[in-house]
């Protein structure tokens, strides 16, 4: 007889859609353990700017993988999958793991699985890192197009971290990153239910602007100043996120506060648009409007009962 797989709920959607509120609605109905899958909310120095759950929200139920990474470090999809599996498996019997976030690559990697990639030698990592700093993201992307055009369809010329990782794997193994991704992987030990928060981009846009205003009121500028004192390196992974980049430029005197807010809102909207495009391609998502907490909770309850 096939062993019953552990149920795991995934709450996904674009930034600012109301994923945290939905997860807390579930936590008031079921014993829930919330696990982050947002690539920006992992950073210790940016709880306000990356909209991590507040202390009051975290008091409702256990929250995992928020604010644990220094600004100088990064985590790739493989590293996230390992940490997420640890947290899922550590959940107590009867406790429902609920993944919350908007980084589609992380979620896809957890659900679909990743083929095991050999460890990359430190000298290769360091060589690629130096090239990234000296030559810039577009130069790495141009090289990646020659050796792994398939993977280039899923990344962007300015995404230095992902492109550097792909080149590291190719240089270390002699095989494209996409080859490793396409390898057959063992079936997942988890039974996933994907709950999507459905919003229209035009409807979301004014909410994103309001969200930025609230972040500024909550001390986003002061948070960025303190982070810059601790890590005055604009190439550090933690500074590459939206909001962090714009506030860093403001702190350095490159732009005024009005321009900071304008760029922050513009870039957040563009990111939300990319997220919506990603999730539209995902299969088996059950969509609910932001205000439909009760419907989503009821649906999860029925799914668990089945």
Curated annotation (Swiss-Prot):
It catalyses: adenosine(37) in tRNA + dimethylallyl diphosphate = N(6)-dimethylallyladenosine(37) in tRNA + diphosphate. The keyword Magnesium applies. Disulfide bonds: none annotated. One of its GO terms (biological process) is tRNA modification. SUPFAM superfamilies: P-loop containing nucleoside triphosphate hydrolases (SSF52540). Residues 38-41, 161-165 are annotated as: Interaction with substrate tRNA. Substrate binds at residues 15-20. Its cofactor is Mg(2+). One of its GO terms (molecular function) is ATP binding. Its EC number is 2.5.1.75. ATP binds at residues 13-20. Keywords: ATP-binding, Magnesium, Nucleotide-binding, Transferase, tRNA processing. Pfam families: IPPT. Catalyzes the transfer of a dimethylallyl group onto the adenine at position 37 in tRNAs that read codons beginning with uridine, leading to the formation of N6-(dimethylallyl)adenosine (i(6)A). Belongs to the IPP transferase family. This is tRNA dimethylallyltransferase. The gene is miaA.
